[in-house]
Amino acid sequence: MPRFTIHDLAATIDARAASGGDASYTRKLLDKGSGHCAKKFGEEAVETVIAAIENDRHHLIAEGADLMFHFLVLLKARGVTFEDIEFALAQRTTMSGLEEKAARNRE
């Protein structure tokens, strides 16, 4: 199976978002607004947690994929790119987790 990365998924979401009248699921989510996208992300997060608690590997993988998709759609709805998230993660690697958390609390 060919490798499919989170960047590939983000590019697919970008293409479907730009597709105008296309009836894709992605386009329908975005057309309903960021609030709806956030609710869908929350639903998928709960389903992912349940799968993890139930120790169901197959279900966790499926729900994790759904969660990643809905996270990227939510980011798109709010004008945030995955590269923005990567930048924030990269900044955090320059300090320990405890230092990073303390810095956030000062802001």
From Swiss-Prot:
Database matches in CDD domains: NTP-PPase_HisIE_like (cd11534)
Keyword terms of this UniProt record: Amino-acid biosynthesis, ATP-binding, Cytoplasm, Histidine biosynthesis, Hydrolase, Nucleotide-binding
Q: Which GO terms describe its molecular function?
A: ATP binding; phosphoribosyl-ATP diphosphatase activity
Example of a GO biological process term: L-histidine biosynthetic process
- Keyword Cytoplasm applies: yes
Recorded hits in Pfam families, A to Z, give:
PRA-PH
Task: Name the HAMAP family on file.
Answer: HisE
Q: Which PANTHER family match?
A: HISTIDINE BIOSYNTHESIS BIFUNCTIONAL PROTEIN, HISTIDINE BIOSYNTHESIS BIFUNCTIONAL PROTEIN HIS7
Question: What protein name applies here?
Answer: Phosphoribosyl-ATP pyrophosphatase
What organism is recorded for this protein?
A: Nitrobacter hamburgensis (strain DSM 10229 / NCIMB 13809 / X14)
Q: What taxonomic ancestry is recorded?
A: Bacteria, Pseudomonadati, Pseudomonadota, Alphaproteobacteria, Hyphomicrobiales
Q: Which gene encodes it?
A: hisE
